[in-house]
Amino acid sequence: MRACLICNTSATVENYARVEAQEYVRCSRCGLIFVDAIKPPDKLYHAYDGGALKAWRRKLVAPWRGFTHVRNFDQSMARAKRIFDFVTAQKQTLPPHPNWLDIGCNKGFLLATAAAQGWQVYGVELVPELMQPFQRRFKQFAHNIFSQRFIDVQTQFNNDTFDVISAIDVIEHFEEPRRDLSGIYRILQPGGLFVAQTPDGAAKQAETLKERWGALKPLEHLHLFNAANLEIFAKQLGFTEIKFFPPFEAADGNLVAVMRK
């Protein structure tokens, strides 16, 4: 079995659930739930693109789709505004032109919301077609969008660059969370915030449903934290203050973490 990335040992790791012929294990010391054998990157990314037919259709439509021409656009923008308001309420002081990086920015609704309030925005999104309408609509930020893994993109940013970094429903996808979160810490400004929503490995569903828990997706959700072990992990990386909040919406037992550098 793989070692727990927080406790740095495999001695405390035990079987948890078997999903789609893959084993999830759990650390008996800290409670981290994780996929024991992570598939190669090409297998993981195939899960994100939705398969050949869906990917082909998305590539065909993307050059013609407008930023607002998506299903449930108003609801998506309302959700982005709720997240933006929550995050900015946690950040008391800001420079004149603050910088916001959204990892896993999807179609760019949160970035559009921040841009409308004067932020300089940057995004990381593995599926490039999703962000093309945003890039056409917000041409001034078109070159701030990166279609790579964050672990590969982060080397392009200087230390102490961002006032806020968000990762909504993302950190569970990280293949190497220690490298990814270390990169996030490095490029945050002193006093900057990292805001993440992620499935809660201590949620009631984790015990009552186990393999039927919707958060268990072995090609996508590779590491499932809980509040206690995520706080330990964040402090190992240097974050000085970690707070937890209810999720932005109820889904499979999520939590929201706010970490301050």
Identify the residue ranges that each predicted region occupies.
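Conserved N-terminal segment of class I S-adenosyl-L-methionine
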Residues: M1-D160, V164-I168, R178-S182, F245-F248, ...
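Short, solvent-exposed loop/helix junctions and linker helices
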Residues: A21, F174, H221-L224
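A short His-aromatic
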Residues: D169, H173
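Short N-terminal helix/helix-N-cap motif within the alpha/beta-hydrolase-1
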Residues: E175-R179, A206
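A short glycine-rich, Lys/Arg-flanked "PGG" loop and its adjoining helix->strand segment in the class I
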Residues: R178-L193
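Short, glycine-/aromatic-enriched active-site segment of Class I SAM-dependent methyltransferases
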Residues: A196-H223, A228-F233
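A structural motif corresponding to the C-terminal end of an alpha-helix
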Residues: F233-F239
